[in-house]
């Protein structure tokens, strides 16, 4: 069977997304990030009009949120989209390269932890920054529930994002956000027309055994 990607489920719906919540429920390798970079980002650039003529304040912009610094580095590489290795750990050099890349005029990449820090500094300043964006992408959205047991600040990021659902297109993406999906369905804030899913692929591992003695291991190898 030919592998399917989430873009084949969404098709052209993204062109008609209105303000509110979008849920993309799909596993690793389903093309969630690829959809954002190769479909939604070019669409945002197109909708913004000519780069040299358009008012920067009227650009259609995307804020891409993720839960870990290593993932942020991967997303930044994907935004460049040139197949080159960029020095994401060298801020000054990276900043110069980003300024030279058109894509970064339309998309920013943050961690959820940055949202938390900025909110603690000044909720008002953070709101002014977030008001610049049309799309908010919440990658690995299970962070809001999965990390909550050991990170009391997680709810800050979630509340900040939730406040924008009425004024932005907020896209939640994850393979394991069932708790969030159940909550949104219960409170009536997730339309089934805004829910996109791909069945999770079964892994290749059928059985996992642990052997604590060398003899057991040797018998398995010899069998």
Residue ranges and their predicted role:
Residues 64, 108-111, 137, 168-175:
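Structural recognition of the conserved hydrophobic beta-strand(s) that form the central parallel beta-sheet
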Residues 127-162, 169:
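SF2 helicase catalytic motif II
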Residues 179-223:
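Interdomain hinge/linker at the junction between the two RecA-like core domains of SF2 helicases
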Residues 8-17, 23, 35-46, 206-223:
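Conserved interdomain hinge at the start of the Helicase C-terminal
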Residues 28, 35, 40, 58-83, ...:
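Conserved Walker A/P-loop ATP-binding site and its immediately adjacent core
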Residues 42-62:
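Post-Walker A helix-loop "phosphate-sensing" segment adjacent to the P-loop in P-loop NTPases
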Residues 19-23, 61-63, 106-107, 135:
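Residue-level preference for the first positions of well-ordered beta-strands
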Residues 79-125:
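Inter-Walker segment of RecA-like/P-loop motor cores
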């Amino acid at each position: 069977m030919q592998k399917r990607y989430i873009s084949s489920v969404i098709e052209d719906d993204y062109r008609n997304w209105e303000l509110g919540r979008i849920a993309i429920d799909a596993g690793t390798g389903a093309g969630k990030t690829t959809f954002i970079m190769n479909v939604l980002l070019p669409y945002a650039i197109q909708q913004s009009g000519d780069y040299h003529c358009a008012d920067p304040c009227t650009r259609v912009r995307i804020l891409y949120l993720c839960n870990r610094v290593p993932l942020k580095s991967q997303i930044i590489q994907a935004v460049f989209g040139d197949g080159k290795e960029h020095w994401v750990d060298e801020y000054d050099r990276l900043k110069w390269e980003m300024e030279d890349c058109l894509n970064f005029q339309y998309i920013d990449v943050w961690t959820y932890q940055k949202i938390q820090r900025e909110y603690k500094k000044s909720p008002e300043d953070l709101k002014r920054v977030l008001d610049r964006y049309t799309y908010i992408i919440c990658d690995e959205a299970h962070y809001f529930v999965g990390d909550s047991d050991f990170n009391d600040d997680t709810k800050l990021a979630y509340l900040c994002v939730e406040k924008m659902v009425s004024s932005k297109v907020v896209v939640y993406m994850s393979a394991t956000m069932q708790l969030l999906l159940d909550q949104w369905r219960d409170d009536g804030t997730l339309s089934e027309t805004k829910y996109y899913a791909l069945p999770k692929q079964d892994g290749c591992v059928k059985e996992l055994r642990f052997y604590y003695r060398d003899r057991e291991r040797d018998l398995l190898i010899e069998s």
